[in-house]
Regions:
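Class I S-adenosyl-L-methionine-dependent methyltransferase catalytic core
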Residues: 1-216
Length: 216
C-alpha cells in the first residue's frame, strides 16, 4: 500500500497549473474512539494510509479551484467541525450538505457502522462554493440531498454520487483521494488508478466484484 510522502507537493506535481470547476474529496481522516480500535490507521486495520488534519488543511486545493467552483467534501459525522475547517482552508464557503444513508440489501438501515454515542448509518457530503454566481445547475434544484445505497468496501463511497455531481455541477472535474479512475474526471490519490481493487476482507459487493459482474 502506498502512502503520502508530501501530499501537497504531490498534488501540485500532478495537477498544478490546471483549474477545476468541481472538486470531490474524500480525505483519509484520522479519528478513533477511546479504545483506538475503529481508527483506519489502527495497526490491525491497515486498510489505507491517513493524513493528519494539518496535512489535509495544507493541501493546495485553493490553487486548483476555478472561480466559480463547487466542492463536495466527504466528512464522517464525528468530524463535522474539522470538515468545515478544511472547507474554509481550501477557499470555499459552506452552503449545505448531502446525506448518504447506508442500507442493507432489503433496504433497511445497515447497522454495521461504528459510533461511540450512536450506531452510524449515515455519512455527510459538505457542499461549498467559491466565487460569485456559483449556484448548482438546473438539475440541482430538483435533486434531494439524500442518497440511500448499500455499502461497498471500507470507506468506499457510492458511485451514484458521481451522477449527482455531474448533473448538478459543471466540469472540469477533479477527485481527490480517488479509488480508481473515472471517465471525464482527473483523479489524484494513492489508490487512483485503473487497477484499484480492495486487498482486505470486505463486503461481497466491493469494487472488484462489481467490475467482474459488469464484464461477465
Amino acid at each position: 500500500m502506498q502512502t503520502f510522502d508530501d501530499p501537497a507537493m504531490e498534488l501540485l506535481a500532478q495537477h498544478g497549473g490546471r483549474r477545476f470547476r468541481t472538486i470531490l474529496a474524500d480525505p483519509p481522516w484520522q479519528f478513533q474512539n477511546r479504545t483506538g480500535k475503529v481508527a483506519p490507521e489502527h495497526k490491525r486495520l491497515s486498510r489505507y494510509g491517513t493524513l493528519t488534519l494539518d496535512e489535509i488543511l495544507g493541501l493546495p486545493v485553493a490553487d486548483l479551484a476555478d472561480d466559480p467552483a463547487h466542492l463536495y467534501l466527504w466528512v464522517p459525522n464525528a468530524l463535522l467541525l474539522e470538515g468545515l475547517k478544511v472547507m474554509e482552508a481550501w477557499g470555499f464557503t459552506y452552503k449545505t450538505n448531502l446525506v448518504w444513508h447506508k442500507v442493507r440489501k432489503d433496504g433497511g438501515p445497515d447497522g454495521r457502522g461504528v459510533g461511540f454515542y450512536f450506531r452510524n448509518v449515515t455519512e455527510l457530503v459538505l457542499f461549498g462554493v467559491k466565487g460569485r454566481n456559483a449556484r448548482t445547475q438546473a438539475p440541482g434544484r430538483r435533486q434531494v440531498n439524500f442518497l440511500a445505497t448499500q455499502k461497498r468496501e471500507h470507506s468506499r463511497k457510492p458511485d451514484e454520487m458521481y451522477d449527482i455531481i455531474e448533473a448538478c455541477s459543471p466540469g472540469p472535474y477533479l477527485e481527490l483521494f480517488a479509488r480508481g479512475a473515472r471517465p471525464n474526471w482527473a483523479v489524484w490519490g494513492n489508490q487512483a488508478d485503473d487497477g484499484y481493487a480492495p486487498t482486505w476482507d470486505t463486503y461481497a459487493n466491493h469494487s472488484a466484484a462489481e467490475a467482474v459482474r459488469e464484464t461477465a
